[in-house]
């Protein structure tokens, strides 16, 4: 069996990329996980989140520490044939456009790649198509995720409290992300990496969940059918029939 991709965050694994007291353990934990788990299963892409966002936002020094930590992990994992691909995420230390660009500009492209998540980038105030265009050679894989149209071009990231009240995520076609433009970019540039559907499960307050009367089983089936059909019909992705 070969693993296509794995995320970090295993039990006991440090994911603190900003605290100088914690980053040595973060490096050691990640290198050990790559050596003991990813490499034996032939996994060659490792998507990593970078922990929680500092309470006052991410400072320039903390961004530099994130980049240095990624560089050191990536320097060691590439020797194992594993490409380290950080995943900017709202509520993480790398969230806003200047932070994403700084992370990529301060990391060595021989050691550190990029996992753009279209929904997370949009929620962070970025134009997902533009940032993917600018850093296309660094992209290891792509996560297709959507949000509501009201967050497109937003200047502020929605809070965790807002997300707790009502999910900031949406099925594909919610209007937050220009998916036809995303797919055109990838096709025009002959992107050869993995493109993954990233969907959060239905919950009370979501459009699809409430429309189906709050039946979780039906909502899950409806979510899957909606997103698979969007990929197939709207984006022209060749997929097997949905049974």
Where in this protein do the model-derived segments appear?
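Aromatic-lined substrate-binding rim segments of carbohydrate-active enzymes
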Residues: 1-2
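Active-site beta-loop-alpha junctions enriched in small/polar residues
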Residues: 6-11, 51-53, 89-91, 117-121, ...
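Short amphipathic alpha-helical segments, especially helix-boundary/capping motifs
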Residues: 8-12, 46-50, 74-79, 156-161, ...
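Short secondary-structure boundary/hinge segments and terminal tails
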Residues: 12-14, 55-56, 95, 152, ...
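The substrate-binding groove and active-site-proximal loops of carbohydrate-active enzymes
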Residues: 14-25, 168-174
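Active-site acidic/histidine proton-transfer and metal-coordination neighborhood
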Residues: 17-114, 215-222, 241
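Histidine-acidic metal/acid-base catalytic patches
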Residues: 35, 97-112, 116, 122-243
């Amino acid at each position: 069996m070969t693993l296509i991709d794995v995320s970090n965050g295993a039990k006991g694994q440090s994911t603190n990329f900003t605290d100088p007291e914690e980053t040595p353990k973060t490096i050691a934990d990640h290198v050990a996980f790559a050596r003991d788990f990813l490499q034996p299963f032939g996994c060659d892409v490792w998507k990593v989140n970078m922990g929680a966002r500092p309470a006052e936002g991410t400072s320039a020094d903390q961004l530099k520490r994130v980049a240095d930590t990624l560089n050191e992990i990536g320097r060691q994992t590439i020797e194992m044939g594993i490409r380290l691909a950080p995943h900017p995420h709202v509520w993480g230390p790398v969230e806003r456009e200047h932070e994403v660009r700084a992370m990529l500009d301060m990391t060595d492209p021989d050691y550190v790649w990029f996992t753009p998540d279209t929904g997370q980038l949009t929620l962070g105030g970025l134009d997902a198509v533009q940032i993917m265009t600018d850093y296309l050679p660094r992209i290891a894989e792509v996560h297709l995720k959507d949000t509501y149209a009201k967050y497109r071009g937003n200047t502020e990231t929605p809070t965790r409290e807002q997300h707790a009240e009502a999910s900031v995520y949406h099925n594909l076609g919610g209007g937050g992300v220009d998916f036809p433009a995303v797919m055109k970019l990838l096709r025009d540039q002959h992107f050869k990496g993995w493109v993954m559907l990233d969907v959060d499960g239905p919950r009370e307050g979501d459009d699809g969940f409430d429309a189906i009367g709050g039946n979780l089983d039906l909502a899950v089936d409806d979510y899957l059918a909606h997103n698979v059909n969007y990929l197939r019909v709207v984006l022209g992705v060749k997929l097997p029939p949905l049974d």
